[in-house]
C-alpha cells in the first residue's frame, strides 16, 4: 500500500491533541462538481428553471449586502431575496445537497482514528445552512459521534473572523494549541486559526489534488468554456482517484479506461438516444452488435420509461454474404464474399482453388459465373436470419436501430429488408450524405463537413469503437435460434481484446454504480462535444503506461476481420529494422504514438519528406514526424514554382 503522507502526518498531530476539529464542505463532504455553484446550474437544467443559477448567486450577494452587521447570513435570508418564481427551489436545493454530497474517505480515516483515541471530535463550518440540516448531512454520510457542531449561521460568527473559534475556546474551556483543525479554506481554516495559536492543517481539495497530478483532466478543464457535464465528470474521476489511492490494490489499466472513457461515452450517447427515441415515439430499440453492447447496458441502467431494448447481430459482413449486396469495384467486398463462401462450402472452395483471383473484377466474375450457387446458399442463410429477427421484433412496434458510425447504412438496410418497412436509425454520426436520402436517421453529433472530422469522430474512431464494443469474437453469422456464429479461428489479437474488454465492462459498471449512488436517475448532461474533446485529449497526450499497454492492441480494418492494424502504438526491435526496414519504418510513420526511441529512429532514418503537388507546388518538410510544427515558409521560385519549407509536423494545416 502506498503511504499517504498527509494522513500519517495528521495522525501524529491528532494523537497529541485534545480536540480534533473538522471543516465540512470540501473536507468531510465532497460535492460531485468542480465548482459548488455548478449545483445551482444542475438544478436549473434538470428542473427547467431558466435563469436560476444566476438568480441564486445574486440573491446570496444581495442578502450579504443587506445584512452588513451579520458575519454570516442564513438560508432563509438568501431565499427572501430571490425572485418569486424560484421560491420552489428552496426545498429542491436542500434536497439536492442531501442527494449529491459524498463522504471523503480520506477524512473518514482521520475521523475514525480520532474517535479510536477518544479525542473530542467537533465540526466547525462557515455555512448558511442550519445546524439541524448540517447535523443530518453528517450523520447521513457516516460522520457520527461528534461532540459539538458549530455553524456560523447559528452563532452569527465565522471562522474567517476568528470569532467562531473563540466561541469554541470559551465553550470547551480548551487552549488553542490543544486543538487540531483541518479544513480547505486558506483563510478560514488555516491562516486565522494559526494566528489564534491552533494547530491548523490546510487540506487541499480532492479535485485540486487530482488536477495537479492528472495532465489530461487538467487540460480538459482548461479547454474551452466550463460546463456542467465536464464539471461532474472530472469531479467523479477525482473522487474515484481518491478512493483508489487509499486502497491496497489499484484497478487494472483497462478497468480505468472503462471507467474514465467507455462509460462516459456510452452514458452521454445513450441519454441522447433515450431523448430522441421518446421524441420519435419508438417502442423498441435494436442495439447492433458489437458497438451496441455497452450502449445497451448504459441505456438500461438509466432509462425509466417503457422502451424495450434488444441486442441484435447485423454487422456489414452479414449484409455482404447474406444479401450479396456489394460494390463490384470494391476488392474488399468481393474478396470477403468469395473467402466466406469458400471457407463455409466445400463445392465453392473446390471451384475457388481452380481460379487465380487477383483483381476486384476477377472476384466479381467468379461470383457471377457461379451465381446460382451463391444465391442458393445466401437464400438459406438469409432465411435463418429472417427467422432470428422475427423472434425479436413485433410487427406492430416502432423500431429504432442503434449503431455507432455509418457510411453505407448496411445494418439499417438489411433490417429494413428483413422487416419490409422503414425503421429509424440513431447514430453517433454519418458520412457521405448522398446515401442518407433513403433512410430515416438522426445523429448524436451531426457531421456537417461530411468528412472524418476529428471534432465529430474523435482523432481515433477505432478507439471509440473499442470502448463501445463487447467481449465477443468477430461474428460470422447467426443461427435460426439466434445464436451468434463466431469466427472459428480468432487470432491472438482478438483474444487480447476480449480479455481486456471484460475489464472495460467492469470499469463501466463501477462508473454507472457511482453515478446512481450520487445522482440516482437524475441526468448529468454530458454533451457530445465534451466527450469528443475528452477522447481527443487522451489521443494527444499519452503517458508511457498508455503507450506500453496499447502496443498489445490491434483492431480489424476489414469486414471479415482478417487484417489487423495497431490502434495507437506498436512494439519494434532492432531485428525488425534489419529484417524489414521499409515495412517497419512505414508502420512507425502511420501509428499515433511512439516511444522516444522509436521517434529518434524515425527522425534519423526519415529526416526529410518531399511532396510534389499539382499546379507546380513543392513541399519540403524537415523532421516531419515531430508532434509540433515550428515554422512554415512559403515562397515562389522564378515565379514558376510555389515552394513550401516547414520544420516539424507536416500534417498541420499551413497557408
Question: Where are the model-predicted features located?
Answer:
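Substrate-recognition "cap/lid" segment bordering the active-site pocket of phosphatases
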Residues: 122-124, 128-178
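Short, acidic loop-to-helix structural element flanking the phosphoryl-transfer center
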Residues: 72-123
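A short acidic, amphipathic alpha-helical/loop segment
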Residues: 9, 106-113, 136-137, 192, ...
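N-terminal accessory alpha/beta regions
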Residues: 55-78
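Short, surface-exposed acidic
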Residues: 47-59, 83-96, 142-151, 176-178, ...
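Active-site neighborhood of HAD-like aspartate-dependent phosphohydrolases
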Residues: 7-55
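Nucleic acid-processing catalytic cores of prokaryotic defense/repair systems
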Residues: 31, 39-43, 111, 127, ...
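Long, low-complexity, Lys/Arg-enriched
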Residues: 166-172, 180-182, 191, 195-655
